[in-house]
Amino acid sequence: MAGDLEGGKSLSGLLSGLAQNAFHGHSGVTEELLHSQLYPEVPPEEFRPFLAKMRGLLKSIASADMDFNQLEAFLTAQTKKQGGITSEQAAVISKFWKSHKIKIRESLMKQSRWDNGLRGLSWRVDGKSQSRHSTQIHSPVAIIELEFGKNGQESEFLCLEFDEVKVKQILKKLSEVEESINRLMQAA
């Protein structure tokens, strides 16, 4: 059985299938498909634990966004661990990660973002031309236009108008946010 799971091409294919399912959202890559295409001679009761082990290793490597030194240390530890992986499997995993790291990282970054993202921001300062109160006409106002959207979809726009008091309030809040971020960065 162990020899059946040693094949580099099959393991590389398995890792690709796991990555497609876990990180790229291809739900058609199922356990049954991987088993029948890559390891048809291995009984399901032996394939499932092997699949779970490889899935766990791949998720650990990806979630830690391991660089190549960390990867080598991690895989070396896995080869020495009871019930771990063989050095041949470690070599295949290392080769796979080196060629797929960037795509997996980008996919994880996309998945971690909110649905809509800020695509653009533009602003200008104008003089107010209409108001309920004549004293406010010609007073300066900041006009901010925000562009929101998902990749591959049409944008939505939000236009905001602020008088001098509101601009000062926003700047104060942004300063508080900056101070909070700086405190957190210094603590880390």
Swiss-Prot record:
PROSITE patterns: COMM
UniProt KW Hydrolase keyword: no
Key words of the record: Copper, Cytoplasm, Cytoplasmic vesicle, Endosome, Membrane, Metal-binding, Nucleus, Protein transport, Transcription, Transcription regulation, Transport, Ubl conjugation, Ubl conjugation pathway
Region (Sufficient for interaction with SLC12A2): 1-122
Origin superkingdom: Eukaryota
Binding, Cu cation: H100, M109, H133
One GO cellular component term: nucleoplasm
Keyword Cell wall biogenesis/degradation: no
Region (Required for binding to PtdIns(4,5)P2): 124-188
Record GO terms (molecular function): copper ion binding; low-density lipoprotein particle receptor binding; phosphatidic acid binding; phosphatidylinositol-3,4,5-trisphosphate binding; phosphatidylinositol-3,4-bisphosphate binding; phosphatidylinositol-3,5-bisphosphate binding; phosphatidylinositol-4,5-bisphosphate binding; protein homodimerization activity
GO biological process, one term: negative regulation of hypoxia-inducible factor-1alpha signaling pathway
Subcellular location: Nucleus; Cytoplasm; Endosome membrane; Cytoplasmic vesicle
Residues in COMM domain copies: 117-185
PTM annotation, UniProt: Ubiquitinated; undergoes both 'Lys-63'- and 'Lys-48'-linked polyubiquitination. Ubiquitinated by XIAP, leading to its proteasomal degradation.
Assembly and oligomerization: Component of the commander complex consisting of the CCC subcomplex and the retriever subcomplex. Component of the CCC (COMMD/CCDC22/CCDC93) subcomplex consisting of COMMD1, COMMD2, COMMD3, COMMD4, COMMD5, COMMD6, COMMD7, COMMD8, COMMD9, COMMD10, CCDC22 and CCDC93; within the complex forms a heterodimer with COMMD6. Interacts with VPS35L; the interaction associates the CCC complex with the retriever complex. Identified in a complex with an E3 ubiquitin ligase complex composed of TCEB1/elongin C, CUL2, SOCS1 and RBX1; in the complex interacts directly with SOCS1 and CUL2.
Function according to Swiss-Prot or TrEMBL: Scaffold protein in the commander complex that is essential for endosomal recycling of transmembrane cargos; the commander complex is composed of the CCC subcomplex and the retriever subcomplex. Can modulate activity of cullin-RING E3 ubiquitin ligase (CRL) complexes by displacing CAND1; in vitro promotes CRL E3 activity and dissociates CAND1 from CUL1 and CUL2. Promotes ubiquitination of NF-kappa-B subunit RELA and its subsequent proteasomal degradation. Down-regulates NF-kappa-B activity. Involved in the regulation of membrane expression and ubiquitination of SLC12A2.
PANTHER family reported for this sequence: COMM DOMAIN-CONTAINING PROTEIN 1
Family membership noted in the UniProt record: Belongs to the COMM domain-containing protein 1 family.
Protein's name according to its UniProt entry: COMM domain-containing protein 1
